[in-house]
């Protein structure tokens, strides 16, 4: 019962109205009020500001500027691995995709096709492949970086719900990551095609990518797609590719037989940007 009540409340709260209001507050310049909000947030979630490029809270004029703060140079060195962790956060789940089914939590799976917005051809590339679901808590650094070199092929904005994506909700809401609003980014990399899915959540005001800027809002209620195959848009391993304006989850997809996850990985473990995530398969 302890977990059922907060999940039930997720169905009752006006998710979109709450998210729009949070976005309005976070993007506004409210002077001393903004500073007070940030200061309280830092205390509540024990945010380590010594890692930030700008550690002085008073220098942030908007909450969003604080939330998407850059790290100081050298704060996240890259491991020597084919795939490095793209975010600071925690491992929600990872492992094999069983045919087209991705494990969310005990008793809950969702399909790769649903996750990528219904594109059967794209989903088929990851049948029996590998996935990693990474949760970013409020205290974490909220920029997303490239796990490896990649050439951008396509971006899809998939409209959806705005449930919270914390571990309790992941255990209680069926198909959570395939029903929330999300941005699907398709790349070609050294180990083959891969996808990074930025999943929205309650009070996630917007998601942005470095090549497009803010993707949402607007929220048109329909699927939107951008193609980049003819633009030779390439990003290097460790380079920023996007950010959450208020936190969420990233789901990464890799083809069958293309990666071996680091043996130290396990669900619930804290991870940091740049640490080893996976390696090329053994020959």
Curated annotation (Swiss-Prot):
Residues under site feature: Cleavage (non-hydrolytic): 247-248
Entry annotated with the keyword Metal-binding: no
Enzyme class of the recorded protein, top EC level: lyase
GO CC annotation terms, alphabetical: plasma membrane
Pathway: Phospholipid metabolism; phosphatidylethanolamine biosynthesis; phosphatidylethanolamine from CDP-diacylglycerol: step 2/2
Cofactor remark from the record: Binds 1 pyruvoyl group covalently per subunit.
Cellular compartments annotated: Cell membrane
Cysteines paired by S-S bonds: none
Location of Pyruvic acid (Ser) modifications: 248
Known EC number: 4.1.1.65
Record-annotated active site: 88 (charge relay system), 145 (charge relay system), 248 (charge relay system), 248 (schiff-base intermediate with substrate)
Protein name: Phosphatidylserine decarboxylase proenzyme
Organism: Methylibium petroleiphilum (strain ATCC BAA-1232 / LMG 22953 / PM1)
Upper lineage: Bacteria, Pseudomonadati, Pseudomonadota, Betaproteobacteria, Burkholderiales
